[in-house]
């Protein structure tokens, strides 16, 4: 999860988030090189006395500054499109969980089980135990098996919401009357925190998400107790 004064993204826990981190570094390097070139040209203009006031056109220069930006945009677009297709591809999910946004809580339904569903509310600050996180803890965590492909179906009962867990690279809009889907896979166990990322009313800040990723054997024992 995030920590105070953090500058970068959260540590990647899923294959998708690892790809997003690589893409972030790739794009940042391109931006850094462009910025360095622009600063170098500006410094030359300020320090040199050589000018070309009589130059009316320069076909070679115009060709370069037309083709070069096009190449740079292609270098950014290709890996971006690859990740978009990866995020949209869901093949043979091992488990499907339906998520519904409400003002202001989340409800979850494990569709592969006959009667496994619950609501998830934020724990008020005055009820937190030592070591628990303010505005991020919930009364019912979403327990899921790690290292398995999980399909999340996301919608809303009232207004627009957004179901987001940054360390897993997840952010999907919850839209009334529409069912969006995304894929989830965690490579290691642990607690992963998120929040509603779409302003949805006065208590928008009080809609946390907590995923508890566990080994398959633990998940089977938990689901048996819940059902």
UniProtKB/Swiss-Prot annotation:
Residues 1-14, 88-227 are mitochondrial intermembrane. It catalyses: 4 Fe(II)-[cytochrome c] + O2 + 8 H(+)(in) = 4 Fe(III)-[cytochrome c] + 2 H2O + 4 H(+)(out). Cu cation A2 binds at residues 196, 198, 200, 204. Cu cation A1 binds at residues 161, 196, 200, 207. It is a multi-pass membrane protein. SUPFAM superfamilies: Cupredoxins (SSF49503), Cytochrome c oxidase subunit II-like, transmembrane region (SSF81464). It is an enzyme of class 7 (translocase). Residues 46-59 are mitochondrial matrix. GO terms for cellular component: mitochondrial inner membrane; respiratory chain complex IV. Mg(2+) binds at residue 198. Pfam families: COX2 (PF00116), COX2_TM (PF02790). It comes from Cuon alpinus (Dhole). It comes from the Eukaryota. One of its GO terms (biological process) is ATP synthesis coupled electron transport. This is Cytochrome c oxidase subunit 2. Its EC number is 7.1.1.9. PANTHER family: CYTOCHROME C OXIDASE SUBUNIT 2 (PTHR22888:SF9), CYTOCHROME C OXIDASE, SUBUNIT II (PTHR22888). The gene is MT-CO2. The chain crosses the membrane at residues 15-45, 60-87. GO terms for molecular function: copper ion binding; cytochrome-c oxidase activity. Gene3D superfamilies: 1.10.287.90, Cupredoxins - blue copper proteins. Disulfide bonds: none annotated. The modification Phosphotyrosine is found at residue 218.
